[in-house]
Amino acid sequence: MRKGNKVSIIGAGFVGSAITFAIMDSGLASDIVLVDMNKEKAEGEIMDISHGAAFVKSVDMKAGDYPDLTNSDIVIITAGAAQKPGETRLDLINKNAAIFKSIVPQVVKYAPEAIILVVSNPVDVLSFVAYKLSGLPANRVLGSGTVLDSSRLRFALAKEFDLDARNVHAHIVGEHGDSEFPNWSAALIGSMKLADYCQEHNINLASLEERISKQVREYAYRIIEKKGYTNYAIALAVRRIVEAILRDENSVLSVSTLDETGSAYYSVPTVVGKNGKIMNLVPKMNDEESLKLAESRQVLKETIAKIEL
């Protein structure tokens, strides 16, 4: 009889491999499976990562196939096509939706009790696709959403104020994409509202918000320009979500979940535990933020309506 937690990752690319390493290093799982169409690639990644076994808690790791997903507590999907020159965003979405049509039924077949965590981009749209294809309750299909974006926001504010990022409490909400935005009115520095902190330290709040918002939006583009992809921070973000689920922490994370209309996935602060989504904690927003959130959700709904499911 299996003891401990089992986490499976589908996709052995830069992100999937980094997530595999992060989960192994965390000690959260006793069993880890990495699945990829290129079995040799998955085997190579598992060999490389597992050779660090002497430095971490005992964990069984293997490169497997879909049947090896059996008894997984969480299945993380990172697989997907990259956007090609001249290819539209909708073309890419339909291509990845087609890939999900081959993946998700296999996940449900072999791991029907698992939480599905989607990381592939565009994550909100593909989380909705996974939800529809799986037939699972919405609470058991999550997207990584804006957990990483929110970490970037906290990093930027912490660097600005020379503080520990763990004491900055702020969330990016909406789409994981161009229509996302910081929920500034709910941001806290320690236990102080950001606006009060700025007033006390003679900081121009409007200027700060504009500058930091731009900086956070551009982080991923700058990284991609320099190294071609992002993989480490998203791996840590996913590890944090996995931790909240496996340890039943009821943590508040800005994962992507189904909205109340049932027509789109988007990110707001959400309580996450062993059953996935427990509830959304939508903070009170000012009029401008409420409008931005509505517009972001509309962008996602319109995109989803065009998908070939």
Regions found by a protein language model. Name each.
Residues 79-81:
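Conserved NAD(P)H cofactor-binding loop of Rossmann-fold oxidoreductase domains
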Residues 20, 24:
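Gly/Ala-rich phosphate-binding loop of Rossmann-like dinucleotide-binding domains
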Residues 31, 35-72, 87, 305:
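Conserved N-terminal Rossmann-fold NAD(P) cofactor-binding segment
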Residues 12-13:
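Glycine-rich Rossmann-fold phosphate-binding loop(s) that bind the pyrophosphate
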Residues 134-140, 149-309:
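C-terminal substrate-binding/catalytic lobe of Rossmann-fold NAD(P)-dependent dehydrogenases
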